[in-house]
């Protein structure tokens, strides 16, 4: 019995502890990783050196346009090191950039916030299909997925766009967005008056 107990103790000494931490999935603006919230506390909970991570991330994204949201997957190793995977910007970012708008619609399906051509859609699909989650998709599946995302943003996919007519549309859209912002601000102020 004592031999078995001795073998068990020696086995326990040789087995290394494995810590199972979940992957951290977050969007970080390119070149703007900082130790403050919300990124700092998330990294601190996983015992990652925050300053070293921010320096590493900013160095990796130095050639990108500053402020572009980048989906990141961070997996932490047991020795407090980490593996950082930086993906391409979200599809909504690309779609809004292609349409020339700042924000999508508040009521998808009822109003059109912008328009893009099939060529724009194909170029975005060619970029997004390189991301690890989308590698197994075909180009047709990727385009269909982007069309559904565009629909939820209020972006209409068309064959051709007349630049002059689209410029007028965007000017009208700016006025509509400004009016919606004013209405939202009035609702917020009315709520504050009721609770105060």
From Swiss-Prot:
It comes from the Eukaryota. It is found in: Mitochondrion. One of its GO terms (biological process) is translation. Its main location: mitochondrion. Disulfide bonds: none annotated. GO terms for molecular function: large ribosomal subunit rRNA binding; structural constituent of ribosome. SMART domains: RL11. Keywords: Mitochondrion, Ribonucleoprotein, Ribosomal protein, RNA-mediated gene silencing, Transit peptide, Translation regulation. One of its GO terms (cellular component) is mitochondrial large ribosomal subunit. SUPFAM superfamilies: Ribosomal L11/L12e N-terminal domain (SSF54747), Ribosomal protein L11, C-terminal domain (SSF46906). The keyword Ribonucleoprotein applies. Belongs to the universal ribosomal protein uL11 family. Component of the mitochondrial ribosome large subunit (39S) which comprises a 16S rRNA and about 50 distinct proteins. This is Large ribosomal subunit protein uL11m. The lineage of its organism: Eukaryota, Metazoa, Ecdysozoa, Arthropoda, Hexapoda.
